[in-house]
Amino acid sequence: MSRLSIATTERYTKDFRVNYIDTDLDSPINIKTVLTKLGVLALFRSLSEGLCGLSIRSTTDDRFMLINSNNNIGRQHFTVAHELYHLYYGTNTVPHICRLGGKEPEEVNADSFASALLMPEKGLIQQLPGEEYRSGKISMATLLRTERVFGVSHDALLIRLLKLHIINDATYQQFKSVTITSEAARYGYDTSLYRPGNNGLYIGTLGEMAKKEFDRGKISEGHYLEILNMLPNERQEA
C-alpha cells in the first residue's frame, strides 16, 4: 500500500473512534481500556532491542498483539495504537512485526494513525494555553502535563506538535535534547510514563482464545494446558 494522505489518516482515526470504540473525536483515550473493549488480546513481554511489538489477525478475525515491555510506557501505548492500524486497516493476516524506525509506507501510515488516534488535533490544541499555542512557544510544563493527559512519550508529543505546525523545528530540537525523566521529576511528576513497565501483563481472555484455537485444532492439548497453567502467574487487566 502507498503512503496515506494526512486527510485519509485522519478519516481512519475518526472512523475508528466512532465505529470501533464508540467515543468522541477529541478526548484522550485509555489504550488498555480500548483493547479490552475491542476484545484484542495483548501480551506485554521483554523482547529484543529495537523490536516494538507484533500483531496478527486470524482468518476468523481474532486479533492478538505482543508489546515490548522494555520500552517506556508511553512508547508502549504508541505501539499498541500502531498495531491497531495493522489489525483493523491492514490487508493481510500474516504476523506483522514492528521495529523502531520502520520507513516502509505501511509503517509510516501506522505511525501517523497512532499519533492522530492518541492525540487528536482539536483535543490536543485544547490542552495548550492560548498564548503558547498562538506563539508556538510551548513551555516544558505544558509538554509534561499534555504527555500525561494523552499517555504518550515525550518524543511522540513533540513529533505530533511539529507535524501540526504548532512548534517549529528549532523548538522541536530544543525539547528533544532534554532528559525527560529529570525534567518530569523536577516538575514534581511521577516518571513511570517514561520508563519501562508492564512486564508480564496481559489484557483480554487468554484462556478463552487458547480454547478456541485448541477446538480448531490449531494448538496441541499440551500447549493448551501449558497456557492455562501459566495464567495464575500472570498479571491480568481486563
Enumerate the predicted regions with their spans:
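Active-site hotspot residues in diverse enzymes, especially metal/ion-binding acidic/histidine motifs
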Residues: M1-A238
